[in-house]
Amino acid sequence: MTAKIIDGKVIAADLRARVADEVARVKREHNLVPGLAVVLVGNDPASEVYVRSKGTQTQAAGMASFEHKLPADVSQADLLAVVAKLNRDPAVHGILVQLPLPKGLNTEAVINAIDPAKDVDGLHPNNAGRLAGGFEALSPCTPLGSIILTKSVHPSLEGLNAIVIGRSNLVGRPLVQLLLNENATVTIAHSRSRDLPGLVKRADLVYAAVGKPEMVRGDWLKPGATVIDIGISRIPKEDGKTRLVGDVAYQEALGVAGAITPVPGGVGQMTVACLLVNTLRAACAIAGLPKPAV
């Protein structure tokens, strides 16, 4: 058996196209142009590339894109002032502060300062709490993308056994809540979990989000399981160069899993696409319009 490859590039492109169609509709019917503001502190090269990608994809979807670049030595007060200004700006419906922030800045205070209605990263305590309570909320983009990828294989997750390996606030915890909302039966595992291979072996759905290269081995998997690899790490190759890998030993898993996301080309493709979804949903909610069809 060779696993089906879940192509994140194709699924993300389809999602972006559907977002663009909905953006055009709300613009035509309601004169509403969703706007996304991204705040970048410092000049980390990887973050700059990511922010540029967000801006390009935002504009390609027909949305307004606003970028605010601040120096690495910006004060906490000045950063919070930028967030407050964006909270008040009626042209901005989504605010994303690129993380991680430089040392000396209080990340929690910055996240808490974002208007929950514009919190398209889904990290504000109001949104995290609503998600945990099973209420409508803006959800973090990577978990949301992971669910969409899973549903490309299993349109209904009801009754399926899922394991989430990793308990971060950004991925693991919100992913558990999204799975519960889909009526899956969820186990959350972490570095202190006993018999992790045994826990994984029972799961129909495996989500690996620990940031440990190729930690999940092929013989851990239940035959036919769907594997969503959320981790990404760069490891050395024999020729002295490096390569990107996920948290799952991909070649081993191919012969056991029923379906699997590659790294790269899987979950990472979905993150920005889901950011566009959240921005569109936020814009419609703020304007008092029905939830868009994405």
Curated annotation (Swiss-Prot):
Alphabetical UniProt keywords: Amino-acid biosynthesis, Histidine biosynthesis, Hydrolase, Methionine biosynthesis, Multifunctional enzyme, NADP, One-carbon metabolism, Oxidoreductase, Purine biosynthesis
GO biological process: one example: purine nucleotide biosynthetic process
Enzyme Commission no: 1.5.1.5, 3.5.4.9
GO cellular component assignments: cytosol
Pathway the protein contributes to: One-carbon metabolism; tetrahydrofolate interconversion
Biological function: Catalyzes the oxidation of 5,10-methylenetetrahydrofolate to 5,10-methenyltetrahydrofolate and then the hydrolysis of 5,10-methenyltetrahydrofolate to 10-formyltetrahydrofolate.
Name the UniProt record assigns to this protein: Bifunctional protein FolD
Pfam family, one: THF_DHG_CYH_C
Keyword rRNA-binding: no
Listed Gene3D superfamilies: Leucine Dehydrogenase, chain A, domain 1, NAD(P)-binding Rossmann-like Domain
Family: Belongs to the tetrahydrofolate dehydrogenase/cyclohydrolase family.
